[in-house]
Regions:
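Short conserved active-site loop signatures built around small residues
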Residues: 169
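Short, hydrophobic/aromatic alpha-helical segments in well-folded domains
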Residues: 172-176
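Conserved "HGTGT" condensation-loop signature of ketosynthase/thiolase-family condensing enzymes
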Residues: 2-158, 178-181
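Short loop-beta-helix segment that forms the pyridoxal 5′-phosphate
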Residues: 158-164
Length: 183
Protein backbone atom coordinates (compact mmCIF):
# COMPACT_ATOMS: atom_id res chain seq x y z
CA UNK A 1 0.00 0.00 0.00
CA UNK A 2 1.35 3.39 -0.97
CA UNK A 3 0.94 6.32 1.41
CA UNK A 4 0.89 9.83 0.02
CA UNK A 5 2.78 12.44 1.99
CA UNK A 6 0.73 15.44 3.00
CA UNK A 7 2.34 18.77 2.14
CA UNK A 8 3.78 20.41 5.24
CA UNK A 9 1.97 23.27 6.92
CA UNK A 10 4.01 25.63 9.06
CA UNK A 11 2.97 27.38 12.22
CA UNK A 12 4.41 30.86 12.44
CA UNK A 13 5.10 32.78 15.64
CA UNK A 14 2.08 32.48 17.94
CA UNK A 15 0.49 35.24 20.00
CA UNK A 16 0.37 34.19 23.66
CA UNK A 17 -1.35 35.78 26.66
CA UNK A 18 -2.04 33.85 29.86
CA UNK A 19 -1.65 33.96 33.62
CA UNK A 20 2.09 33.59 32.99
CA UNK A 21 2.22 36.91 31.14
CA UNK A 22 2.16 38.38 27.67
CA UNK A 23 4.27 37.24 24.71
CA UNK A 24 6.13 34.13 23.65
CA UNK A 25 9.45 35.07 25.30
CA UNK A 26 7.72 35.70 28.66
CA UNK A 27 6.09 32.27 28.47
CA UNK A 28 9.30 30.47 27.53
CA UNK A 29 11.16 32.17 30.39
CA UNK A 30 8.39 31.36 32.89
CA UNK A 31 8.35 27.71 31.86
CA UNK A 32 12.13 27.26 31.79
CA UNK A 33 12.91 29.35 34.88
CA UNK A 34 9.90 29.08 37.22
CA UNK A 35 9.51 31.76 39.84
CA UNK A 36 8.96 31.24 43.56
CA UNK A 37 5.57 32.90 43.30
CA UNK A 38 2.66 31.20 41.58
CA UNK A 39 0.80 32.87 38.71
CA UNK A 40 -2.37 31.20 39.99
CA UNK A 41 -5.17 33.13 41.67
CA UNK A 42 -7.13 31.61 44.55
CA UNK A 43 -10.82 32.47 44.76
CA UNK A 44 -14.25 31.22 45.79
CA UNK A 45 -15.87 33.26 43.00
CA UNK A 46 -16.85 30.21 40.93
CA UNK A 47 -17.97 27.77 43.65
CA UNK A 48 -19.53 29.38 46.70
CA UNK A 49 -17.90 28.25 49.92
CA UNK A 50 -14.92 26.58 48.21
CA UNK A 51 -11.62 28.15 47.22
CA UNK A 52 -9.93 26.94 44.05
CA UNK A 53 -6.77 27.88 42.18
CA UNK A 54 -7.14 29.14 38.63
CA UNK A 55 -5.14 31.08 36.10
CA UNK A 56 -6.20 34.65 35.41
CA UNK A 57 -4.72 37.37 33.24
CA UNK A 58 -4.37 40.26 35.65
CA UNK A 59 -2.38 42.75 33.56
CA UNK A 60 -3.90 45.82 31.95
CA UNK A 61 -5.28 44.77 28.57
CA UNK A 62 -5.12 46.63 25.29
CA UNK A 63 -8.32 48.66 24.97
CA UNK A 64 -10.81 47.50 22.37
CA UNK A 65 -11.28 49.84 19.39
CA UNK A 66 -13.60 52.76 20.23
CA UNK A 67 -15.93 52.16 17.26
CA UNK A 68 -16.57 48.50 18.14
CA UNK A 69 -20.21 47.43 18.50
CA UNK A 70 -21.56 45.93 21.74
CA UNK A 71 -21.73 42.51 20.06
CA UNK A 72 -17.91 42.36 20.02
CA UNK A 73 -17.28 43.85 23.48
CA UNK A 74 -16.36 40.99 25.82
CA UNK A 75 -13.48 40.06 28.09
CA UNK A 76 -12.77 37.08 25.82
CA UNK A 77 -12.42 39.33 22.77
CA UNK A 78 -10.34 41.84 24.74
CA UNK A 79 -7.92 39.06 25.75
CA UNK A 80 -7.79 38.03 22.11
CA UNK A 81 -7.24 41.62 20.95
CA UNK A 82 -4.43 42.00 23.50
CA UNK A 83 -2.69 38.83 22.28
CA UNK A 84 -3.16 39.64 18.59
CA UNK A 85 -1.18 42.85 18.98
CA UNK A 86 1.90 40.57 19.03
CA UNK A 87 1.20 39.32 15.48
CA UNK A 88 -0.86 42.16 14.06
CA UNK A 89 1.69 42.96 11.34
CA UNK A 90 1.62 39.29 10.23
CA UNK A 91 -2.19 39.30 10.06
CA UNK A 92 -2.28 42.48 8.00
CA UNK A 93 0.46 41.12 5.71
CA UNK A 94 -1.54 37.91 5.12
CA UNK A 95 -4.65 39.91 4.22
CA UNK A 96 -2.60 42.05 1.78
CA UNK A 97 -0.88 39.02 0.24
CA UNK A 98 -3.85 36.65 -0.12
CA UNK A 99 -6.77 39.08 -0.07
CA UNK A 100 -9.52 39.53 2.48
CA UNK A 101 -11.71 36.90 0.79
CA UNK A 102 -8.99 34.20 0.88
CA UNK A 103 -7.88 34.82 4.46
CA UNK A 104 -9.57 32.58 7.03
CA UNK A 105 -10.00 32.87 10.79
CA UNK A 106 -10.01 29.45 12.48
CA UNK A 107 -9.90 29.52 16.27
CA UNK A 108 -10.38 27.43 19.36
CA UNK A 109 -12.22 28.63 22.48
CA UNK A 110 -14.15 27.22 25.38
CA UNK A 111 -16.14 30.25 26.47
CA UNK A 112 -16.54 32.86 23.72
CA UNK A 113 -18.19 35.86 25.39
CA UNK A 114 -20.61 33.87 27.53
CA UNK A 115 -19.38 35.49 30.74
CA UNK A 116 -20.80 38.84 29.63
CA UNK A 117 -24.32 37.44 30.05
CA UNK A 118 -23.83 35.94 33.53
CA UNK A 119 -25.33 39.00 35.30
CA UNK A 120 -28.58 38.50 33.37
CA UNK A 121 -28.69 34.76 34.09
CA UNK A 122 -28.05 35.38 37.80
CA UNK A 123 -30.74 38.08 37.82
CA UNK A 124 -33.28 35.67 36.29
CA UNK A 125 -32.23 32.87 38.68
CA UNK A 126 -32.90 35.29 41.54
CA UNK A 127 -36.44 35.89 40.25
CA UNK A 128 -35.88 38.88 37.95
CA UNK A 129 -37.13 39.29 34.40
CA UNK A 130 -35.28 38.61 31.16
CA UNK A 131 -35.82 42.16 29.91
CA UNK A 132 -34.40 43.80 33.05
CA UNK A 133 -30.70 43.47 32.13
CA UNK A 134 -28.78 43.69 28.85
CA UNK A 135 -28.27 40.51 26.83
CA UNK A 136 -26.37 40.18 23.58
CA UNK A 137 -26.74 36.87 21.77
CA UNK A 138 -23.79 37.59 19.48
CA UNK A 139 -21.43 37.83 22.49
CA UNK A 140 -22.65 34.44 23.63
CA UNK A 141 -22.17 32.52 20.37
CA UNK A 142 -19.14 30.26 19.88
CA UNK A 143 -18.30 32.09 16.65
CA UNK A 144 -17.95 35.40 18.51
CA UNK A 145 -14.11 35.42 18.60
CA UNK A 146 -13.68 34.61 14.90
CA UNK A 147 -16.33 37.16 13.91
CA UNK A 148 -14.55 39.75 16.07
CA UNK A 149 -11.16 39.06 14.43
CA UNK A 150 -12.69 39.13 10.95
CA UNK A 151 -14.39 42.43 11.75
CA UNK A 152 -11.36 44.29 13.17
CA UNK A 153 -8.98 43.10 10.42
CA UNK A 154 -11.41 43.33 7.49
CA UNK A 155 -11.29 39.59 6.76
CA UNK A 156 -14.10 38.21 4.57
CA UNK A 157 -12.97 34.60 4.15
CA UNK A 158 -14.08 31.49 5.98
CA UNK A 159 -14.27 31.86 9.75
CA UNK A 160 -15.31 29.53 12.50
CA UNK A 161 -14.51 28.41 16.02
CA UNK A 162 -13.80 24.91 17.30
CA UNK A 163 -14.98 24.28 20.85
CA UNK A 164 -13.96 20.94 22.34
CA UNK A 165 -12.97 22.05 25.84
CA UNK A 166 -9.29 21.24 26.44
CA UNK A 167 -8.44 20.35 22.83
CA UNK A 168 -10.00 23.39 21.13
CA UNK A 169 -6.67 24.99 20.19
CA UNK A 170 -5.18 21.78 18.81
CA UNK A 171 -8.36 20.98 16.90
CA UNK A 172 -8.40 24.49 15.41
CA UNK A 173 -4.82 24.00 14.16
CA UNK A 174 -5.76 20.64 12.62
CA UNK A 175 -8.77 22.22 10.90
CA UNK A 176 -6.69 25.13 9.62
CA UNK A 177 -4.03 22.75 8.25
CA UNK A 178 -6.72 20.77 6.40
CA UNK A 179 -8.09 23.97 4.88
CA UNK A 180 -4.63 25.06 3.74
CA UNK A 181 -3.98 21.67 2.15
CA UNK A 182 -7.32 21.75 0.35
CA UNK A 183 -6.27 24.90 -1.49
Amino acid sequence: RRTMMKPPVYLSRPAVTSALGNGLRTHIDALLMPSETSPLTFSDQWVKGKTFAFGAVNETLRPLPDNLSAAHRSRNNQLLWHALEQIEDDIRAAVRRYGAARTAVIMGTSTSGADENIPLFQHVADGGGWADKPFNQLQHEMASPSEFVAHVYGIHGLRYVVSTACTSGARALISAARLLRSG
